[in-house]
C-alpha cells in the first residue's frame, strides 16, 4: 500500500512539473520576438511571380512561383487555389509566406476562357502532376529567374484553400489517380470545404465522419474562418474546417480566425472577375484583409518552422496565447489542454 501511494505521488509530481514547464518556456520566449511571424519576413521576394505557362519547362499546368531572392535552400509549399479562383488572386498572401523563407508553387487549375471546369478528381490529379513535375523542373525554372535559390523537396508541404483545401487532403491521403513521385512532409488545410452539405459533397468523398480516421502520419494543421459558415455560407458546417480537424489524428492543430470570412485572404485588387463575385457572395468581415493575411500567413509560417526548421517556439506560443495574433483567434491542438474554450463558438 505504501509503495502504491508513493507511486501515485510520484506521478502527480511529474505531471504537475510538466504542466508548469510549458508556460515557463513560453514566458521566456515571449521576449524573443515570438510575433515576428505576424509581420512581413526578412527575405526580399521576387518582384513579380514567376509565371510558367502550360508546357513551358514541361509544366503540366500553368503555375506561378514566388521565391525569396537571396541565394539559399528553402522549403517548398505547393498550394491549390479555391473554387473557380485563380492562383494570382492569392499573390499578396504568397508574397507574405515567401518573405519568411519559403518557395510557393501554385498551379492554376481553372479558367473561364477557354472554359476549363475540372471535376474535383481532375483537380487532385492535376495537382499531383504538378507535384511530380517539381523534382525535374522546379530547379531549372529557379535557376533561370533567381540565381542561387534552391527548393528543398525533402521539406515539401501541401496546402490548399476551400475546395483546394479538400484537394490537398485528398492528395495527402492517396486519392490521386496519378502515383506521386514526391513525399509530402506537412499538410495545411486553409478553410477546406468538402461540398455544400453532408448530402451534397464533391467526389471523391474524403470525409468519413469518424473521429481521428484520416490515415496521415505527417504533421497537419487546419485553419478556418469564423464567418465561413455565416450566410451566405461558403464553408458550411459539417463539411468544413471543424470536420476536417475532427478526423485528423493526435498531434494535429486547429485554428479559427474568428472575425474573418472565407475569402478574406485574397488580394484587395488585381482579382479575377470570378474572385470578385465570389468574395461578394461569401460572408466577409469588411476589416483590413492585410490583417487576415498576416494572421493566416503567420500561423502557417510558425507551423512550418516547427516541423521544417525544428523551431516550435512561435507555433506553441500561438496555441497557448492566442492574443499574440493580430486579430481574434481560436486555437487547439490534440493532446494539449490549456483550459480554454473547447470550441471556437464558445469565444
UniProtKB/Swiss-Prot annotation:
Regulation: Inhibited by diisopropyl fluorophosphate (DFP), phenylmethanesulfonyl fluoride (PMSF) or p-chloromercuribenzoic acid (PCMB), but not by N-ethylmaleimide (NEM) or iodoacetamide.
Phenotype when changing residue 254 to Y: Reduction of activity
Record-listed E.C. numbers: 3.1.1.14
Glycosylation sites: 215, 229, 251, 321
Keywords attached to this entry: Chlorophyll catabolism, Glycoprotein, Hydrolase, Signal
Active-site feature positions: 162 (nucleophile), 191 (charge relay system), 262 (charge relay system)
One matching Pfam family: Chlorophyllase
Signal peptide range in chain numbering: 1-19
Propeptide: 20-30
GXSXG (motif): residue ranges: 160-164
Enzyme class: hydrolase
Superkingdom field: Eukaryota
UniProt catalytic activity: a chlorophyll + H2O = a chlorophyllide + phytol + H(+); chlorophyll a + H2O = phytol + chlorophyllide a + H(+)
Family: Belongs to the AB hydrolase superfamily. Lipase family.
Note: It has been proposed that CaCLH0 is transported to vacuole via the endoplasmic reticulum where it might be glycosylated.
Protein name: Chlorophyllase type 0
Species name: Chenopodium album (Fat hen)
Amino acid at each position: 500500500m505504501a509503495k502504491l501511494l508513493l507511486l501515485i505521488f510520484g506521478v502527480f509530481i511529474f505531471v504537475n512539473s510538466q504542466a508548469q514547464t510549458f508556460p515557463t518556456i513560453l514566458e521566456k520566449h515571449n521576449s524573443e520576438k515570438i510575433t515576428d511571424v505576424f509581420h512581413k519576413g526578412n527575405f526580399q521576394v521576387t518582384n513579380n511571380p514567376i509565371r510558367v505557362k502550360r508546357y513551358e519547362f514541361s509544366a503540366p499546368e500553368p503555375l506561378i512561383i514566388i521565391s525569396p531572392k537571396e541565394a539559399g535552400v528553402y522549403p517548398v509549399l505547393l498550394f491549390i487555389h479555391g473554387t473557380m479562383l485563380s492562383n494570382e488572386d492569392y499573390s499578396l498572401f504568397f508574397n507574405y509566406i515567401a518573405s519568411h523563407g519559403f518557395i510557393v508553387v501554385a498551379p492554376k487549375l481553372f479558367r473561364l476562357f477557354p472554359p476549363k471546369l475540372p471535376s474535383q478528381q481532375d483537380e487532385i490529379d492535376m495537382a499531383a502532376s504538378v507535384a511530380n513535375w517539381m523534382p525535374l523542373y522546379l530547379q531549372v525554372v529557379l535557376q533561370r529567374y533567381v540565381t542561387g535559390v534552391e527548393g528543398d523537396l525533402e521539406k515539401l508541404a501541401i496546402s490548399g484553400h476551400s475546395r483546394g483545401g479538400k484537394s490537398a487532403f485528398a492528395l495527402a491521403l492517396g486519392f490521386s489517380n496519378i502515383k506521386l513521385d514526391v513525399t509530402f512532409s506537412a499538410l495545411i488545410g486553409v478553410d477546406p470545404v468538402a461540398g455544400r452539405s453532408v448530402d451534397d459533397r464533391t467526389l471523391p468523398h474524403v470525409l468519413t465522419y469518424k473521429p481521428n480516421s484520416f490515415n496521415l502520419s505527417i504533421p497537419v494543421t487546419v485553419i478556418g474562418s469564423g464567418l465561413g459558415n455565416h450566410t451566405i455560407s461558403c464553408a458550411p458546417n459539417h463539411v468544413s474546417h471543424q470536420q476536417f480537424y475532427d478526423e485528423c489524428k493526435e498531434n494535429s492543430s486547429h485554428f479559427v480566425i474568428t472575425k474573418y470570412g472565407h475569402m478574406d485572404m485574397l488580394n484587395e485588387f488585381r482579382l479575377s472577375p470570378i474572385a470578385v463575385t465570389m468574395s461578394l457572395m461569401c460572408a466577409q468581415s469588411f476589416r483590413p484583409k492585410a490583417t487576415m493575411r498576416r494572421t493566416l500567413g503567420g500561423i502557417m509560417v510558425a507551423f512550418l518552422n516547427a516541423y521544417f526548421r525544428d523551431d516550435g517556439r512561435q507555433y506553441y506560443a500561438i496555441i497557448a496565447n492566442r492574443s499574440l495574433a493580430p486579430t481574434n483567434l481560436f486555437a487547439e491542438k490534440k493532446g494539449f489542454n490549456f483550459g480554454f474554450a473547447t470550441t471556437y463558438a464558445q469565444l
